[in-house]
Curated annotation (Swiss-Prot):
Keywords: 4Fe-4S, Cytoplasm, Disulfide bond, Iron, Iron-sulfur, Metal-binding, Methyltransferase, rRNA processing, S-adenosyl-L-methionine, Transferase, tRNA processing. The active site is at residues 105, 355. Specifically methylates position 2 of adenine 2503 in 23S rRNA and position 2 of adenine 37 in tRNAs. m2A2503 modification seems to play a crucial role in the proofreading step occurring at the peptidyl transferase center and thus would serve to optimize ribosomal fidelity. Signal peptide: none annotated. This is Dual-specificity RNA methyltransferase RlmN. Gene3D superfamilies: 1.10.150.530, Aldolase class I. Its EC number is 2.1.1.192. Binds 1 [4Fe-4S] cluster. The cluster is coordinated with 3 cysteines and an exchangeable S-adenosyl-L-methionine. One of its GO terms (cellular component) is cytoplasm. Belongs to the radical SAM superfamily. RlmN family. GO terms for molecular function: 4 iron, 4 sulfur cluster binding; metal ion binding; rRNA (adenine(2503)-C2-)-methyltransferase activity; rRNA binding; tRNA (adenine(37)-C2)-methyltransferase activity; tRNA binding. It catalyses: adenosine(2503) in 23S rRNA + 2 reduced [2Fe-2S]-[ferredoxin] + 2 S-adenosyl-L-methionine = 2-methyladenosine(2503) in 23S rRNA + 5'-deoxyadenosine + L-methionine + 2 oxidized [2Fe-2S]-[ferredoxin] + S-adenosyl-L-homocysteine; adenosine(37) in tRNA + 2 reduced [2Fe-2S]-[ferredoxin] + 2 S-adenosyl-L-methionine = 2-methyladenosine(37) in tRNA + 5'-deoxyadenosine + L-methionine + 2 oxidized [2Fe-2S]-[ferredoxin] + S-adenosyl-L-homocysteine. Disulfide bonds join 118-355. The gene is rlmN.
Length: 384
């Protein structure tokens, strides 16, 4: 469990009330204790909040009237609102969600046997990966716990209300939306705790995945805070290419990154002994057969499966998508080494909801100095 201090600065709303979506179960129990109530009341309220997506205390029928009145005075359940919805021809739904004066994007991806929700962790991103639309928007701020878990809450409420249309309930959550999750550990971890909690969304730890570009000290800290599935945004077979397309590699190179991944795997049960490697396919940049051989050699000591991701274009990007034939040749080389290799099916690209296309609406774009400061905060273990 994380130990984020509950203070008015990080959980109160503009109305001076506590937003209960900001609290994991440990914090919720402390909140009810401060109200003079038994801890089980926290469990009851969480069940209403997350099992039934209820944000009205009056509808919580197993809570006595006096306590409901007390809760209405000091607390609320306020998830961020959907301000725009786009539906893809393949069933994918993208929601633009208001977080203060900005927007982030959340994507619902239904499949035959599951439904995955792609969740954002920051408004914008500080890492400046060259092939990603989010990075081109700059960085504004971290999302609060309520703004992260609130994306899941809002999506679950919408999908739950639309069961008659055949939409599947959310079975998987991936922290692969806007932002670098490891640069916002103090909010991302409590949000994931709620996803896993039986009184929260009750997801299996194997069905909650965090994706990172390689903030190594924060990855080491993550392993001591929570156990979830891990995916890494590698995207290159060597440091020369990765330095160019994933600039954080200049600080934490591939060898350092993969060593941290192996340390995480030693602690984790959620990963079942292997990590997911994400590798975006950029035409004549990182997609040659020689690159595939280099990648296989690079990963020989890291138990993994490899997801090859056809690059999804956005305006002004300097890259092209690898052809199907180049992706096929690349994949066959990896499989010849015995790697489980999957070519990810592109979903939602007609509504700019595919991997690397999320942009949101970042207001007051910050300059490079703030991005450097943001990276420094994550690298300083005391600050994450």
């Amino acid at each position: 469990m994380s130990e984020q201090l509950v203070t008015p600065e990080n959980v109160t709303t503009k109305d001076g009330k506590i937003n209960l979506l900001d609290l994991n179960r440990q914090q919720m129990r402390e909140f009810f204790k401060d109200l003079g109530e038994k801890p089980f009341r926290a469990d009851q309220v969480m069940k209403w909040m997350y099992h039934y997506c209820c944000d009205n205390f009056d509808e919580m029928t197993d809570i006595n009237k006096v306590l409901r009145g007390k809760l209405k005075e000091v607390a609320e359940i306020r998830a961020p609102e959907v301000v725009e919805e786009q539906r893809s021809s393949d069933g994918t739904i993208k929601w633009a969600i208001a977080v203060g004066d900005q927007r982030v994007e959340t994507v619902y991806i239904p499949e035959v046997d599951r439904a995955t929700l792609c969740v954002s962790s920051q408004v914008g991103c500080a890492l400046e990966c060259k092939f990603c639309s989010t990075a081109q928007q700059g960085f504004n701020r971290n999302l609060r716990v309520s703004e992260i878990i609130g994306q899941v809450w809002r999506a679950a409420k919408i999908v739950g209300a639309a069961k008659v249309t055949g939409q599947r309930p959310i079975t998987n959550v991936v922290m692969m939306g806007m932002g670098e999750p490891l640069l916002n550990l103090n909010n991302v971890v409590p949000a994931m705790e709620i996803m896993l909690d039986d009184f929260g969304f009750g997801l299996s730890k194997r069905r909650v995945t965090l994706s990172t570009s390689g903030v190594v000290p924060a990855l080491d800290k993550l392993g001591d805070m929570i156990d979830v599935a891990l995916a890494i945004s590698l995207h290159a077979p060597n440091d020369e290419i990765r330095d160019e397309i994933v600039p954080i590699n200049k600080k934490y190179n591939i060898e350092t990154f993969l060593a941290a991944v192996r340390r995480y795997l030693e602690k984790s049960n959620a990963n079942q002994g292997r990590v997911t490697i994400e590798y975006v396919m950029l035409d004549h940049v990182n997609d040659g057969t020689e690159h595939a051989h280099q990648l296989a050699e690079l990963l020989k000591d890291t138990p993994c499966k490899i997801n090859l991701i056809p690059w999804n274009p956005f305006p002004g990007a300097p890259y092209g998508r690898s052809s199907n034939s180049r992706i096929d040749r690349f994949s066959k080389v990896l499989m010849s080494y015995g790697f489980t290799t999957i070519v990810r099916k592109t979903r939602g690209d007609d509504i700019d909801a595919a991997c690397g296309q999320l942009a949101g609406d970042v207001i007051d774009r910050t300059k490079r100095t703030l991005r450097k400061r943001m990276q420094g905060e994550a690298i300083d273990i005391k600050a994450v």
